[in-house]
């Protein structure tokens, strides 16, 4: 980051402050000039330098940030594959992901081989299952995030037939648990066929499959599927990975040495164990000639020529990055298979320039034909490069038998050329979120539609003002100018079937995968989500992520708030009226040899009031639930199946105890976050230090239940979910880099 404004870069980005901030804060190295930046990230390649300057192409975030600096990896993401069911391997994976984060890469791993909770360890002890290890991997991701300029990114997946699938589905219902990882369920054809049979009336909801082995258990697929859809509707996770399509629909389908195990964090790269993805994206909107006219069309000749330069440049990155992988195994896999991840962005802008409405039948046809062209010519470019540089070491002629290869319309001469030269790369296309680079160019990201064509930007992150101003996407202004308003649909205007059909059209000719989010309205029901996942599977998607508006607490708003920013204004609050009865939690706490009773009254499952006192006689009572009944002012009765306390206020031993419970109760009622109450109470010393410590210990049990909005770690604004990834429209931050 540099405070010196580079005028050339500012002009290149059309004077857009947000775009410039992204370039300056994320991709500029030590205040370098725009010309030096262009030279560094292009590696001196004149054609790539031209494509970047023309905004037709950009490398992925890690390459833009790190190329030529010698600092860290040029690859965005990696895969650890299956975590084996041994303590040694589990701990090794934890170390490996930490080292990968240090190198600025993300990680994906599958928990499917880890024995479930209750399974025996050495015929003596029962396993605690996957959850403790999920927590460990999450903590590692969080801790490395604190010490790096790039935040750790993690995907954990689990086979839906695993005994702990239900726990896996439910775990994110607590928004503070596993908050540094994306979760996806691995779902095979057998499971989805059962779901399809159910909706066709062939089987009932109680249909059960029994597993007998080291541990026996029953799976009820229909009920499990409904639970999955309910939680996806409420919490936007887990996502789903359709494993038969994910692992087999690629060029390496019949190559035994190449076994896909899971994906990178955003899901656009199914990878083998220790696989890596180098990412880049072509801005298709810049290939439209005669835009906003009846003669608009894609310049296929230019696109074909440029595709070779892109494949060549990405192949260079593989060799250049070998010294920067965190693990030798990652280096070995990169050398053997030479994976590429060439993606696209600006699809929606492209369609607008051609007068085509995103999601329409025509748009689906255009995207399908376009991706067929891109994939075919990427293969031909890789084959041409193989003729110059040699085949990738893991090449096998069985590639020509793969389903996706044979879906391409080939000329006889083209097939002959590929047979003769082979391929330089095992994978070619991968459509990533492009949250940061797409926002930097001020275009639609990946294959997503625009979330909003205008939004309010808080200028506080740019200067020290407290005002917002409305920002319009340049494409929208152009569309209005030329009378193309009918093309200005947003993600909210597009049905879930249209979202899926667009993704399916592209997926047919993307040999890895696509990161995309199906945005759905607030009133969406779990029953609708059930139909979404089924349709996505039937249409051949490799994975599916949904986002119901309002789930996981708010996404970014495209409406200006009528209220001042609450973080900058002092606001008085009014406590909700206390009902006669409150549910309550009863605790006995031992602290420094003394026993205390703490009773917490709950309103809507959140602490509303607290009563506490030191016990003169030690109680032998377990923690339990009861009720606090307000009999009259200064008379609060506690009742449960274990005991009755006629008046809680008469239990205080002194005025200090009464005061020490009165004040936190007032703070709770007025909505003060528990963590701040605890922080303040810990400052108390003297005669009642042990008493307040006991209260703090109880209150800390509720901090994990406090739900906070998902906000940008850079500027504090709300995030939007797009292409399976959280990004900020205010400062350009993207969770996926």
Label each region the model flagged.
Residues 206, 212-214, 306-331, 357-434, ...:
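Internal maturation/activation junctions in enzymes
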Residues 52, 56-67, 160, 311-322, ...:
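Core structural elements
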Residues 1-74, 81, 225-227, 234, ...:
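Acidic/polar, glycine-rich intrinsically disordered N-terminal extensions of enzymes
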Residues 559-601:
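Short, Gly/Pro- and small/polar-rich lid/capping loops
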Residues 66-78, 86-110, 157-160, 164-165, ...:
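Conserved phosphate/anionic-ligand binding catalytic regions in large, soluble enzymes, centered on
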Residues 712-715, 728:
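Short cysteine-rich clusters marking metal-coordination/redox-active sites
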Residues 4-14, 75-300, 323-333, 378, ...:
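Active-site cavity-forming subdomains of large catalytic enzyme subunits
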Residues 260-263, 267-270, 315-322, 404, ...:
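Catalytic alpha/beta core of large soluble enzyme barrels
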């Amino acid at each position: 980051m540099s405070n010196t404004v580079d005028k050339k870069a500012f002009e290149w980005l059309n004077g857009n402050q947000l775009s410039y901030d992204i370039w300056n804060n994320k991709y500029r190295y030590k205040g370098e000039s725009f010309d030096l930046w262009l030279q560094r990230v292009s590696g001196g390649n004149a054609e790539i330098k031209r494509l970047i300057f023309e905004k037709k192409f950009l490398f992925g975030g890690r390459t833009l940030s790190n190329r030529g600096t010698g600092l860290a990896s040029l690859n965005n993401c990696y895969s650890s594959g299956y975590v084996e069911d041994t303590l040694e391997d589990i701990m090794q994976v934890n170390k490996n992901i930490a080292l990968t984060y240090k190198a600025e890469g993300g990680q994906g791993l599958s928990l499917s081989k880890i024995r479930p909770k209750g399974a025996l360890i050495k015929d003596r002890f029962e396993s605690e299952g996957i959850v403790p290890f999920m927590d460990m991997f999450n903590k590692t991701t969080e801790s490395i995030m604190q010490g790096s300029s790039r935040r750790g990114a993690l995907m954990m997946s689990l086979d839906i037939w695993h005994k702990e699938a239900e726990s896996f589905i439910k775990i994110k219902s607590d928004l503070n648990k596993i908050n540094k990882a994306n979760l996806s369920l691995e779902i095979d054809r057998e499971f989805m066929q059962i779901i399809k049979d159910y909706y066709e009336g062939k089987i009932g909801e109680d249909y059960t499959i029994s597993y007998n082995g080291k541990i026996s258990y029953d799976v009820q697929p229909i009920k499990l599927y409904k639970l999955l859809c309910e939680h996806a509707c409420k919490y936007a996770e887990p996502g789903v990975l359709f494993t038969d399509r994910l692992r087999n629909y690629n060029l390496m389908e019949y190559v035994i040495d190449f076994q896909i195990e899971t994906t990178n964090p955003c899901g656009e790269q199914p990878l083998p164990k220790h696989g890596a993805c180098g990412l880049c994206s072509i801005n298709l909107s810049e290939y439209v000639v005669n835009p906003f006219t009846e003669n608009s069309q894609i310049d296929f000749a230019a696109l074909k020529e440029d595709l070779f330069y892109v494949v060549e440049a990405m192949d260079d990155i593989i060799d250049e990055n070998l010294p920067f992988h965190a693990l030798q195994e990652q280096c070995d896999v990169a050398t053997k298979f030479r994976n590429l991840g060439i993606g696209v962005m600006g699809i929606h802008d492209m369609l607008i320039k051609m007068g085509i409405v995103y999601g329409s039948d025509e748009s689906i046809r255009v995207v399908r034909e376009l991706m067929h062209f891109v994939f075919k010519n990427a293969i031909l470019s890789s084959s041409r490069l193989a003729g110059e540089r040699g085949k990738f070491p893991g090449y096998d002629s069985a590639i020509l038998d793969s389903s996706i290869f044979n879906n391409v319309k080939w000329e006889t001469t083209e097939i002959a050329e590929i047979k003769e030269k082979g391929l330089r790369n095992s994978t070619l296309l991968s459509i990533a979120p492009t949250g940061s680079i797409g926002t930097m160019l001020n275009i639609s990201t990946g294959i997503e539609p625009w979330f909003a064509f205008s939004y309010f930007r808080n200028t506080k992150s740019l200067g020290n003002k407290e005002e917002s101003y409305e920002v319009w996407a340049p494409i929208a202004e152009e569309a209005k100018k030329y009378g193309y308003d009918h093309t200005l649909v947003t993600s909210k205007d597009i049905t879930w079937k249209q979202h899926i059909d667009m993704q399916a059209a592209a997926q047919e000719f993307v040999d890895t995968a696509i990161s995309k989010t199906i945005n759905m309205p607030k009133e969406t029901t779990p029953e609708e989500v059930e139909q979404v996942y089924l349709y996505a599977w039937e249409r051949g998607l490799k994975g599916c992520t949904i986002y119901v508006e309002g789930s996981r607490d708010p996404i970014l708003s495209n409406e200006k708030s009528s209220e001042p920013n609450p973080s900058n204004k002092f606001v008085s609050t009014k406590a909700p009226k206390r009902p006669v009865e409150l549910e309550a939690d009863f605790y006995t706490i031992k602290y420094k040899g003394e026993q205390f009773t703490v009773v917490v009254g709950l309103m809507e499952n959140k602490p509303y009031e607290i009563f506490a006192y030191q016990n003169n006689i030690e109680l032998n009572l377990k923690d339990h639930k009861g009720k606090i009944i307000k009999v009259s002012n200064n008379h609060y009765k506690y009742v449960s199946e274990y005991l009755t306390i006629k008046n809680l206020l008469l239990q205080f031993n002194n005025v200090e105890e009464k005061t020490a419970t009165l004040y936190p109760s007032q703070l709770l009622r007025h909505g003060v976050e528990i963590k701040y109450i605890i922080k303040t109470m810990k400052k108390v010393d003297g005669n009642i230090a042990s008493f307040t410590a006991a209260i703090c210990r109880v209150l800390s049990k509720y901090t994990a239940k406090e739900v906070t909005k998902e906000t940008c770690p850079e500027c504090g604004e709300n995030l939007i979910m797009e292409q399976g990834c959280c990004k900020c429209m205010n400062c350009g931050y993207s969770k996926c880099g």
